Amino acid sequence: GYIPLIQTLGGKPVFIDTSASAFKITPELIKQHISDQTKAILLNYPTNPTGVTLSKSEVEVIAKTLSDYEIFIINDEIYAENTFNGQHTSFAEFDFIRDQLLLISGLSKSHSATGIRIGFLMGPEYLIEKLTFMHAYNCICANVPSQIACIAALNEGLDAPQYMNRAYIERRNYLVSKLKKLGFELDAQPEGAFYIFPSIRNYTSDDFDFCVKVLEEAHVAMVPGSSFTDMGKGYIRISYAYDMDVLKEGMRRLERFLKANYNI
């Protein structure tokens, strides 16, 4: 949803291909893409669609790199609580970029509360004042039932993501093993969120056509990587925010599809 918003406001999105660095942004990639026209950089960790996240040392190096530029850092940390190995490191932990940083989060992923549409924005006071003014004329406020649900989640359900993550890890491990047996390749191990982003290069390069055929013939829904920009061509995104029984049935159907169409 970020691309149309940027374009609507007259901006030009510039994409960084991270496929060669295990889908992780690096200081070198940042330096290659920032110009005197750059106004902001938008980051998302743990990441949709790859499930990749950053270590504390990686976040710190990136923060130090970005502190050299007079640009805003917009970091979408909506999947922060869905970090599997170790503690999520927020860009907000580094004081030297706080005047540049806008941090986005919410309850949609951490508490599976996609329906209540409650989000949070943190940033320097001078920016929040202006953004609050804009927000007031766009949606006025969050509805009261959603606010009540949010309060309950924050007061009584802070441990909920821990239990959810245990299930996500089990499902991820199952999918990693099963997909590799079926001939898919993984360029990076997902360590957060609830997505896996395998390559279909052993079968075809047309990810869109592949997903359409799997949907029509096997009745399994996956997202073509190219829907996340052209840099995702040749990959597919699979969500494991489902019960294990559903995932296993989906893999059985996918296996039958591959046998029928690719003679595996």
Predicted segments with their positions:
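PLP-dependent class I/II
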Residues: G1-I264
